[in-house]
Amino acid sequence: MKSGRFIGVMSGTSLDGVDVVLATIDEHRVAQLASLSWPIPVSLKQAVLDICQGQQLTLSQFGQLDTQLGQLFADAVNALLKEQNLQARDIVAIGCHGQTVWHEPTGVAPHTLQIGDNNQIVARTGITVVGDFRRRDIALGGQGAPLVPAFHHALLAHPTERRMVLNIGGIANLSLLIPGQPVGGYDTGPGNMLMDAWIWRQAGKPYDKDAEWARAGKVILPLLQNMLSDPYFSQPAPKSTGREYFNYGWLERHLRHFPGVDPRDVQATLAELTAVTISEQVLLSGGCERLMVCGGGSRNPLLMARLAALLPGTEVTTTDAVGISGDDMEALAFAWLAWRTLAGLPGNLPSVTGASQETVLGAIFPANP
């Protein structure tokens, strides 16, 4: 069974940077050693945002974007290796999620698309890459997401305490770790995505640092109720979503009914939308004793305060409290999934994704010997 140092690479729907994590992984433990966040150039970020919202690209433009993202991921890995004084031979493999540009797990021909050419990563780092983690699950009738609950269960499940792990990235997803029950998990809806999109358009900022804008505004209750009526929120699990659904166009359609509103009030309303949709799903799933939060949203003081207020019987903490950086959780999960793939072990949970069976995930792009 392959064990040793692995690197996880994650570029999420928030597009707030490329997260790269170095960890030692074997069948008994996952030990994080180092991490870094690598910036995404503004032009590349905008190109990804455009394609996620349905803007047409030529095949040439699409191919260029795929290559450029692969090169960006490789640069991020090489920066971490240099920082840690490591060589390619010191790493077993890289687990790279890729950049999701479209996720449509239902319909006539279910599919999901992550780009960032893994061949570029192998060529530029000299390290074997495991990528394309989601499509095997979809081929077996699953949603292809979320995949991280399997990792949450392996690291954070407790024999007697009802726990849930909440990842607030661009999309928020919940892992249900309830003793005596199959692991559950699904996307609750927008996490940081709409908040980030709004402040990017209104103030040119990548995100609302310390929720300054949101805390300066007031929740617009009619707008909140209008958004909460979206059918996704009442759809039963398994379910998953992404930027192709909850995007700036979605927000604009709701704002048409509310002309002239204060931008800070919209920011406050979007924060409340995220908090309310998450807390409702926690309660609908039977509640928990401890909610452990990770992802960029775990650094949002308003979101954390609202979750604690909406879930008075639950201890709301970050995963940092149990020794796992909330900023690095997803990248660490894909390093672990790469280890599972190389070990020939399944990486999905049918109870979470709805797939017909457990399966080994991903495609392996081997480095030259």
Curated annotation (Swiss-Prot):
ATP binds at G12, T13, S14, L15, D16, G17, V18, D19. The keyword Nucleotide-binding applies. Keywords: ATP-binding, Carbohydrate metabolism, Kinase, Nucleotide-binding, Transferase. It catalyses: 1,6-anhydro-N-acetyl-beta-muramate + ATP + H2O = N-acetyl-D-muramate 6-phosphate + ADP + H(+). Its EC number is 2.7.1.170. Pathway: Amino-sugar metabolism; 1,6-anhydro-N-acetylmuramate degradation; Cell wall biogenesis; peptidoglycan recycling. InterPro entries: Anhydro_N_Ac-Mur_kinase, ATPase_NBD. Pfam families: AnmK (PF03702). CDD domains: ASKHA_NBD_ANMK (cd24050). The keyword ATP-binding applies. Optimum pH is 10-11. Inactive at pH 4.5. It comes from the Bacteria. Strongly inhibited by ADP. GO terms for molecular function: ATP binding; kinase activity; phosphotransferase activity, alcohol group as acceptor. One of its GO terms (biological process) is peptidoglycan turnover. Belongs to the anhydro-N-acetylmuramic acid kinase family. PANTHER family: ANHYDRO-N-ACETYLMURAMIC ACID KINASE. Catalyzes the specific phosphorylation of 1,6-anhydro-N-acetylmuramic acid (anhMurNAc) with the simultaneous cleavage of the 1,6-anhydro ring, generating MurNAc-6-P. Is required for the utilization of anhMurNAc either imported from the medium or derived from its own cell wall murein, and thus plays a role in cell wall recycling. This is Anhydro-N-acetylmuramic acid kinase. The gene is anmK.
